[in-house]
Amino acid sequence: MSNHSEAYGSRDQRREKYTQGKEFEDGTLETLESIISAVEDETLSKDYQPLIVFFQRGFGAQLVQTWSYYAQVNNHGKFSKTTSLLTKTLRVLSSDTSTVTIGSGLIRLILTDYTKVLYRGLNNMRAQLTNPILRLLKQIVNFNNGQHIEELVSYFDFSLPILPRLLVPSKSELANGNSSADSSKHDSLRFTFIKFWLTLISNASPFVRKELLTENFKIMSNLFKFMNKADSDKLSEHILSVFINDILKEKSFKRTTKTKILNELAASKIHHFYYSSNKNLVKKANEFFLTFGASRDFSVAFPDNCVWFKNSVADGASHGAPITVNQVEFQIHNKLLFNTLRLFKPWEDTLQLGTLIKILENVPELVAPYSIFLTTNGNYDPKMTSYWFGITLLINKIINLKIPQFMEKVDSNIPPATSLVIENILPSLLTKSSLVKSLQFETPIIRQLACQSIVLALKKLEKVSTFYDQKGWRNEKTILLNEFHTRIPDLPIFVSTLSNSLASNKDNRILPLSISIIFNYYSKMFPNLFSINLPSSNIYTDIMQKSKISGIEFAILDNYLQFQEFNSTQTRWWNPSSGGNSLFTLLLKLASSKNASNVITTRISNLLDELTRTNVIFNISLISPVMALVNSLQGLSLQVSEIDNMEQVWKWFDETISRVVKTPYKYVDMAKEYNYISPFIMCLSEQWKYVDKSGNPEFLIKWLILFLRNMIFIGEDHIGIDKLVKNVFPEVSDHDVNIYLKLDSFEENIKKTNSSNSLISSMKSSSFFQYISALPSKNLMNISRLPVNKLDAAGILFRVQLLVEDDSVVYDNWFEATACELTGKIASYMVTDTEFPIIKVLERYINFALPKLAIEKRNALLMKKSRFMCNLIGAVCFETGHQLVEFREIIQKVVFSGENVEEYANYNELYQKEDVNAFLTSVSEYLSTSALTSLLMCSTKLESTRNILQKLFNEGKTIKISLVKNILNKAANEDPASIKEVNISLAKFFEENKVCVDASSDPMGKLSLSETTSLINSFVSSDLNYLVLKAFYRWEHFSFPSFIPSIWRIKDSPLLSIVTTAALFKHMQDKDFSAFAHETISKYGNEIAKSTYTTSKSEIFDEILNMITTYIDFYDETKRNEILKCVLSQSDHKYHAATVRYIAAHNNFTYPGVETWLHKTLLYLTKYLSERKVISNSFFELLRAMAELLKLEEVPNKLNVKIINSQLEAILGSEWIKQIKVLEYVIVLIFCVSKKSIQSQRMVQLLLSNDSYSSIMIKDNDEDSSYRKFLSTMILFSLFSIDPVVNSTPIVQEKLLTFYSGTISSNDKLILKILETIESHTATSWTNMIFSWEFIKDEEEEILEAIGDTRLITKEREGLILTLQKNMIKKSIDRYVLERPQVPELYTDSNTNNYDATTRCDLVKKYYDDTERSGVDMYDPLFLLLLIIHNKELVKMVKDDEGNVTYRYEFENFLDCKIFQFIICSLSDCHTVANISYEHLSNLASSLEKKTAQMNLEKQITSKDNERKESDSDLIKYNSIYQVLIKRILYQRQQNQDPINPLIWFSISRIVDLLGSPTAPLHEKAYRWVLSNSTIRSWDIPMVSDVMMSYNKRQQDDNKKEIDMEIYYGELSWVLTTICKGIKTDEDYKMLEKKGVFEWLLNLINMPYLKERLRELIYFIFYKVQRVADDGGLNLISRNGIVSFFEVLNNNIKSRLPQDDILNNIGTLRNENRGTLNTTLRLAQEQNGIEKLLLGYNELVKSQKRLILWTEGDSDNVVKRLRK
């Protein structure tokens, strides 16, 4: 009370103050109130002038003072009224732009000086006073669209204890609940505060909103707590809308933020709204949960890299949270969502059911635990209750979920966990006993639903089984099938259920259908276990004896006939029943009826095809002949008037099918006379004479013609059918035969067909097949209809075939367009029907395209059209992705000799070579590499050669030198332009070393003498081959000794001799080459010097000049000057790269005209870069040559400053800075001129404002992006360093911060250097601008991949947002780089006047190369260690009672974000970094001690709470072990003991992870290691010795051998990973060698059951040793015999690999067995790793004379043996 009295005075004093000011203040308030009322009352034109005058006179401040005064004297009425008046005033001031400034001033006055008045009103906790304050705050938020929200958040303390209390409803409100009147709710404190709060977070920026929601958890908790009890439906809807739109759908909020705000409490309260009577609220709640859990873009679901795996396929670990459901343990990443699902009751309403299923679909890892959770609600015994029906629907929908996308994409040798997969197929609630009870339940609906669940489970099992086959998990598939089989009822149960169903209700067809489907799937999935005994009279026999069958009966028969294949008895479907038809005929009836849909017709046709396929009934054709038969019968069914006579047809079919099945070969022999047409047609013709033809047989003739015509269209021999009709069917007139069955004059016959009354005419509208068959050729381009089945597609192919074979159809644009249009229809159809055999027609066209030599008459038109069709078929296969392998195999088999096509296989001698070339060229786009190379070996057009070479190059293929020779020979007399294009392609192969030798005796693969001689003969065939020859000389297999005997063969070729002389300059010591070179350079040097080189030879001027430049020292000064004079006079070549190189080599800038030339050349560069949109290769060459010239010592003094600056402006302000060669040139340009010459400030501004530079630094992510970023930043660094004082501005600093990534990359180090310089000149730290910190955890990496790279620093309106990534910190630990190159000093006092550009360029290039070599994928240790002290979540500022400020380290946060581990790892760094790390460790130790002491004190105070006591004890123990570890580290430093190797520090950082994982197998050992000693010993690598010794100990204990070996492999994996990642220096290598680690690793490789991953780790350890150890680990060669060890290992693996080239056989292996492919690829990968190691050791051996003698020179033989 005393404090209060001192602040506000006594009651009497306050009353006196109030009385004195009452009259004036009341008058002021009344005036304002009248002004506000007047403005609000005006409707059209509002007059704000009185209000403006009121505030201009200073009454605004008095108003606020009066308001404050009323609060002080507790005049509640006046205070409330004044508060409301302020709210109205702000509302009016916000309504017009002329008064917004006044309102802003009023708000700032309130926030800066009168926030205590706001607090006083809120603390009163009475609706009369508090509600107006809340409305005032809401108006402040709304003012001018949220203009003052940030100021409100800054000045107003949202941590006030009163704010959460405002959300606690009164007892009366709780008693009334949601049913209370809206008016009363609007007056409640909770309602008003929620409206203010929702307005605030909706209008706040995302960053402010996040801070409000996360920092004020008590407010959010109280808001959630009473949502379902006190809030009206309308308010609840508003709350949910804000949650959805402003939290869940806020793109800047990460999932961790969303889960922190919308926690389990929120979900539980919101779920209550499902039971609201307000439908809109129910929909809104459902929308919330859909967004919360099912939305792929906005949900809180964290990505799961396990799904059906127990551990991550990436690293073998499980990162999920452990949960236990009904005594079953799971590791899940979405515990919040799982607990949310437990709230749902999907059996109560479909809305919850649909939402739950969508969440499970989005988060498939929850399916298994949720399925187990359902078992906690009770058993599944059948009952006629709503719960049972609801839970059945839920289970069925769970079973029906698709295979997760993650599983579809994953490629792992480790199979999924069967226990998880089975829950996705058959949830545990569906026990065998409950299913049996359901199948035997008396109510049919229960039995049907049980069958439905089993059917869905079997369907899912089939999909998963196929999926397992695709992934190569066949062993696990067997386990899965066995597990499923034990969970479903036995087959006799289903048979019994089927019999009981028929006995109780014969008309019920649904349940028998379900059981039939079960039998069908059962027979497919468990063929060896499938055997049922049906009674003699059953539903299947009953249906087959019926005269008509329905659709559902057909479905029953369909399944029955399929599972009968696996049963002991077979159905005689071909025999007619007594008084009825055969099943074959019955199915034809059903398929051809008017009411049969296309789906039913297709399904029956497929079934009949399956039945007839094993019998000799139809010939093999393009598609199933049954479809053609059904189609003809459909035409017959359209003849309504003749339907009564259909029985004749059905009887005819019965007799036909019965006989052809029983005696098929009789009809095969009969068909011999008719070109072996189908036996069915022959039997049909045999039975024709027995068909009753009384009445009107005309309809039979119509059908017969239609059927035979259909058969011809799908591939039956039309000549044989024509002969058969004439001999057996005399009733068919010759006129009809000619029109419908003959292919001659097909186009004329179509017109007659369309005008006749045949069945074809009547079917055109219903059958696409008949439509396309009767369409005139001229209309084939205008088909709007699409094929819907195989028969339709076959009709299209037949029409195309007729066009191809019709000689009257010429090959023109119309033919190409029509063929493309029709083939496009096939391609669109194959999108849905991938099995359509389009490849079957390929051989026919190949036969047309490649007539055999024996055929004298060649049809060129038919050949050309057929080649085009082969190309179209290849295009269809390529575009659809189906049958491409078969396409290639057919072509290779026909075209080449032999079945197995190797490279350069010979053509089949049955065909003319020219025909084969033309054919292969037409389909070259779709051929395999071997076929293409064979084609290139033969004579083909240069245009095709160029295209094929480009295709091979783009696919990364290699070609043989013999192919190059062949191409050069055949191009000799071709068009020069074509030759040049081909030569450019060949040169690329040489430059990329993609040309291999055919045969070589040289162990290093050099070209032999005979091969070189032969190749030189090919080169001299044309002078235009100089491009290939130039690349040939740089080829890795080029051998100068093999070349020199042939050198004089190129003497007569000017370009070749010039190129040879220039390229082989380094071999001038050779006598023969020296003579050749002197003759060449003398001849052409004299011609240039005398200016006698004619214009006709100007095309080789550049090559001559390049040669002269190379041999410039061989000319005297006079000759050089003569050549220079000639060069300067050549206007066509003045600005060529060759000219620049010569002038640079001549290096005489005092020669008349050279300086002028230099200025003009620079101007030419500027003009070119300013005007051109595309840069040519020749200009890039010019830039490179100019860069070399500018490095010369004399050049800087000759440069014009204005030209240089204008050129820099042209480049730095354009898009050309994205070109690496341009950037390299700019760096040289900057280095070669005086610092004072460049306008650095302007250039820095140009570069930073260039969007292209921003794009380079932020968006670029290609293979050259690293170098491009470095060059562009180096330019900025150089320009900045010219005048750092002037360039050190806040704008430059802010821009650079957005480009900085905080890594040790070369460009980041340069930016950091600039930032340090700016801070030193401005004396302000950029860390003051940090507004917010973000920390991205592992679970959010998937989001980063979706939205792109997340910058370390981003600029927002509020300030800088700094984002650290946990994954990046992990990488920084694993890939910690100790030797980090420092930024070179380019502008120091020592070289201020030294403009040696060459030295600087070399320094820059060396800096980049060294940085890239060391690795850049880690945070800069110094930057990170200094930055973390600014993060309030890591280091908090604490004030004690005396006002002293201390800093507390939040150890748990250090541990969680891996920074503690990073600190330990950085102890191996340089002294500066290590000292900072030790300082952090000291502070961490101090903070831990204080926290432990505080917890002990609290423990004593709250010792009565046993649960808390126990948890506190665990936490104290948890902190204590880290205290011990830190003290050990600090003690080691105090004792000044031997330095600790980096490997040990890295091992300790990994120990930290084990200490925090109590369930880890190595946790106990890690704990013991920490407690084992008081210091860190320089030779003690944690865990290594234990694991090395443990194997022998475990083998002595036979009882626990199997269990312990699994533990051992886990420990071994940890140790190997630690060594592999931790070995960084030569000292690490020596320490491991002393401990015998390498010998132990070699012994491990011999373990038979060592996992592939562990074996790879061992290989990589030796790989790192070769590069880390100073001598490469030579002792391993001499002492451990590692070379011979790996060579034996390599030979062993080679013997297990296929003999063929693996890469060329991947497609075959994938088709045969995915498991075999995986095994083969693993072996190939292991072999590749071993060969790399052997090649590395070979280089080490050759580097030591002692080892060469020791190995007796066998190292080269090792390489030979590898290449065999």
From Swiss-Prot:
InterPro entries: NopRA1_C, Npa1_N, URB1. PANTHER family: NUCLEOLAR PRE-RIBOSOMAL-ASSOCIATED PROTEIN 1 (PTHR13500:SF0), NUCLEOLAR PRERIBOSOMAL-ASSOCIATED PROTEIN 1 (PTHR13500). Present with 5890 molecules/cell in log phase SD medium. Keywords: Nucleus, Ribosome biogenesis, rRNA processing. GO terms for biological process: maturation of 5.8S rRNA from tricistronic rRNA transcript (SSU-rRNA, 5.8S rRNA, LSU-rRNA); maturation of LSU-rRNA from tricistronic rRNA transcript (SSU-rRNA, 5.8S rRNA, LSU-rRNA); ribosomal large subunit biogenesis. The gene is URB1. Residues 1-23 are annotated as: Disordered. Associates with pre-60S ribosomal particles. Predominantly associated with the 27SA2 pre-rRNA. Can associate with a subset of box H/ACA and box C/D small nucleolar RNPs (snoRNPs) required for peptidyl transferase center modification and with small RNAs snR37 and snR42. Interacts with URB2. Together with DBP6, NOP8, URB2 and RSA3, forms an RNA-independent complex, which is required during early maturation of nascent 60S ribosomal subunits. It is found in: Nucleus, Nucleolus. Residues 9-23 have a biased composition (Basic and acidic residues). GO terms for molecular function: mRNA binding. Required for 60S ribosomal subunit formation and pre-rRNA processing. Required for normal accumulation of 25S and 5.8S rRNAs. One of its GO terms (cellular component) is nucleus. Disulfide bonds: none annotated. The lineage of its organism: Eukaryota, Fungi, Dikarya, Ascomycota, Saccharomycotina. The keyword Nucleus applies. Its main location: nucleus. It holds the Pfam family Npa1. This is Nucleolar pre-ribosomal-associated protein 1. Coiled coil: none annotated.
